A protein has these predicted regions:
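C-terminal substrate-binding/catalytic lobe of Rossmann-fold NAD(P)-dependent oxidoreductases
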Residues: 21, 30-121
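Donor/substrate-binding cores of folate-linked one-carbon enzymes
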Residues: 16-24
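Rossmann-fold dehydrogenase core element
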Residues: 2-13, 27-35
Length: 121
């Protein structure tokens, strides 16, 4: 949610900032880095991956100037680990009462860069 303040400044939620940083990282790192998205939500959540996880995947695609729907890879549920691929793989974990955690990871095989966000309410 974006709010306009009396000082004409924009207050942006941190998940929107994560989306923006994901786009920048994807564009900056280029094709040598593979990416994946991991998310955790409460055990009652039915959909996977979450809308936010898909939004972050779109951020990766935008950064690469690629069609997101052609970049969607495998969608895992409750895996302890999951692979990188030429496409964007997603892993969704459902446990407890977790409000939401999202993590975008880029790997070149020699380096890993991770962006993450955790919500508490």
């Amino acid at each position: 949610m974006i709010k306009k303040t009396g000082l004409l400044l924009l207050v942006v939620t941190l998940i929107n900032l994560l989306m923006y940083l994901t786009e920048i990282a994807s564009k900056s790192l280029g094709s040598n880095f593979l990416s994946k998205v991991f998310e955790i939500h409460h055990k009652h959540k039915k959909d996977h991956p979450s809308g936010t996880a898909l939004m972050l995947g779109k951020g990766i695609a935008i950064g690469k100037n690629k069609d997101f729907y052609k970049l969607i890879g495998k969608k895992y549920l409750n895996k302890k680990s999951f692979p990188y691929g030429k496409k964007i793989n997603f892993n969704s974990l459902r446990k407890g009462e977790v409000v939401g955690e999202h993590e975008v990871t880029f790997s070149s095989g020699k380096e890993i860069i991770t962006l993450n966000h955790e919500a508490f309410d």
